[in-house]
Amino acid sequence: MNPAIVVVGSLNMDFVVTVDCLPAPGETVLGRGFQMIPGGKGANQACAAAKLGGPAGSVRMAGRVGYDLFADHLKASLSAAGVDVTAIHATRAQPTGVALIWVDRRGQNSIVVASGANHELLPVDVAALRPIFRGARFVLFQLETPLDTVARALEAAREEGARTVLDPAPAQPLPKELLARVDVLTPNESEACRLLGRPVERLSPEEAPALAGELRNLGPETIVLKLGEHGCYCLSAALEKFVPGFPVEVRDTTAAGDTFNAALTVALAEGRLLEDALRFANAAAAISVTRLGAQASVPGRSEVEEFLRSRMLS
């Protein structure tokens, strides 16, 4: 049986240091704690989709790792969450990817990624993914693997009848031909600015509709502009609306975007209406920022449903 959701993307081991404030260039600061946590945008989203979705095997991840202990740990973590890891293969060309993450007391972070084996997921590998895409409802992508591979895989997923979701992170300009193969594009503010060739800046919610309109003109069917604590703005043929976020006490924002993307994809794969899917995604992301870490911060489905019920009653 083919999975309902396929995630094509990165796997990294995250080295997380908590600090009082993020270091300035040339500055040394003392950390308050250290953790080694499974991560990578692709792996985070696959883990989140499995925890938020249906039965084991309904989510499969495709990616590359090295021949090392980090690879074993990452695959075991995904398997424990219910992700099918049979399309994650090892390469001797590079070690498993790693990310160095600093998190301050406000929950804000800075991240440096050494991609390693993630760069070995090549366009030639996409042919082997076609049978996995066939029958899947959605294929979810990010940009921590080679751009040529993402472009080829987007095309293949569409040709095999799946709908596509692209989280355009890390932020970078993208060719219009690639964006035309995206059904749902989910940038945050800085990623939206980079896609449009603008200086990266903090945007007011009032600017979201115009920005989303410009992004939709690039080709994607649906734009979901993530606005942090403000929630998100959606522009599609069926919906033009702000969907507000949920105020919570923020501890760590590391995997908020990954949780949002996974939750949105799960809800859409289940056939939920777009506005309901966005509310589900906002709730899942809100819970995740109250916890430290990437995959460890992702809530289960029952937690999100209970969170939504409690907010409707309050």
Task: Kindly label every feature range from the protein language model.
Residues 125-129, 136-210, 230-232:
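Conserved beta-alpha-beta core of the PfkB/ribokinase-like small-molecule kinase fold
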Residues 86-91, 101-138, 143:
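Conserved phosphate-binding/catalytic loop of the ribokinase/pfkB sugar-kinase fold
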